Amino acid sequence: MKKLGVVLAAGVLAASLALFGCSSNSTAGNDTKKDDSAKADTSYTLVKDGTLTMGTSADYPPFENLENGEAVGFDVDLCKAVADELGLKFEVVNNQFDTLLTGLAAGGKFDVVLAGMTVEPERAELADFTDTYYVDDQAVAVMKDGAITKDNAKEELNKAGVIIAVQSGTTGETYCRENFPNATIQPYGNSTDSFAAMQAGQATAV
């Protein structure tokens, strides 16, 4: 027996993504006749019997965010589809982003993590990652009517007195620390608070 962890999810997610890509001809009847072998698989343990528990930081729409207190978004839908394929119930645990991998590695909180997370060597030491399923760019945001523009941002943001709000533990934080060493990098627990700080005049950029 072993924990489900991300090791099993790696295979399941890859299979699920392949299934989604060719399932346009499936019928409701076929959906109700899932392979019993998935449901009968007892080679792993779960945090909660019969339930796939997903850890996330629900502040990153459209991948994961809260609507009326419920986690929704692309990652949530993807993980729920995996749970359905395994014949499991599904739950989401909302945690601060910089605690997700340590929480997964420690066990007892959640079985898998989906949180728009970039694969990095340091993170791979704590957990096994699936194949990349989405590629995107990151950008620094500033107030629209301010003096900083995309043409001068590289120089203007790298000055003493500039405060850049970042979400703690993200690759965005790493990028800002490496590229704006003269600015003050102020971590926040979630991206919502980071943007709120800028809008309140407590930060120059996010």
Regions found by a protein language model. Name each.
Residues 56-61, 71-84, 135, 139-195, ...:
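Bilobed "Venus flytrap"/periplasmic-binding protein-like clamshell domains
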Residues 1-20:
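Sec-dependent bacterial lipoprotein signal peptides
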Residues 61-66, 122-123, 175:
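Short, solvent-exposed loop/turn elements at domain surfaces
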Residues 80, 89-155:
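Acidic, polar ligand-binding/catalytic clefts
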Residues 88-89, 106-115, 162-163, 190, ...:
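Alpha-to-beta junction loops
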Residues 92-103, 186-200:
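Short helix-initiation/N-cap motifs at beta->coil->alpha
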Residues 39-116:
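Extracytoplasmic small-molecule ligand-binding "clamshell" domains
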Residues 18-34:
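Bacterial lipoprotein signal-peptidase II cleavage site
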